[in-house]
Amino acid sequence: MKKALFALVVSFVSVNSFSHAPFVAPSNFIVAGGHTAVFAGFAELPFDSEVAIRGFEFSLFNPNGAKKALPLTNIKAVSVADVETSQEGTYQVIGQRKADIKYANLDQRWLRVLDTKDTKLKPLSERDFISELEVNEKTPQVSVKRFDDVITYFSKGKSSKLVKNSDANLTLGYSVHPNELKKNQPLIIDLAVKGKAAKNFNVEVEKQHKSLGEQDVVMKTISNHTGKVILNLSETGAYIVTISSPNTAEKVKPIADVYRTIISLNMSE
């Protein structure tokens, strides 16, 4: 049965309550008509957009590999794009941005600086971040670049070989086509950055709820020394897969670029 993502009810509480994560997803992962819609936004709950996307440049790859810019129209809670689907096969959507991530050193700990409005924060010793209000001109600070990709796939009529996207900051290789996922069939994703295996990358999987009161499904793992990560998805439904650079020790000054890729997937059977 076809299921529109935004008709589903979700109740998963995000791990990071101080920020909304970006995502992009089709209105349906399997389409039949000549046009479909793609949604993007910032959300705390999987697929539950609260703020329209901003800061990202989006591109569409059609089944033949042709790439074109994908403009999105914003309303307050979400952004939407119209996609012509005249060809059969798999379409890829990718949004990209580059941002500065600021860290500050306090009590010999390098902590990420977050612009949070929360005035009832836990003591600093119990947090892994620092607020803008706690930083002053005498506080040692450093910035690194973070490269964000948001990616999704949908197919018309049939799935087709994924077009290699040379623009992706984090290269992804799938053991199973993203639109052909099946229950209890392991999904192996090969991760690479600039041609080198992305080892020890953090991977978190969140499942969209289908009904009120449904238990949260959250999986966490890391990529191995060859950049492979194995995901065992045991329930049908829509998933957000977040892949990010390894964490650095708080006493170590951040110097390297960091990467985050957020993928929207669906398992229908």
Mark where each language-model region is.
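Glycine-centered loop-to-beta-strand initiation motif
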Residues: 76-79, 87, 219-237
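Start-of-domain marker
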Residues: 20-81
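Short, aromatic- and glycine-rich surface loops/edge beta-strands on solvent-exposed regions
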Residues: 89-101, 238-245
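Positively charged n-region of N-terminal signal peptides that target proteins for export
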Residues: 1-4
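Short acidic/polar inter-strand loop motif in beta-rich domains
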Residues: 97-109, 247-253
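Beta-strand-rich domain onsets/edges
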Residues: 20-36, 121-187, 192-201, 209-213, ...
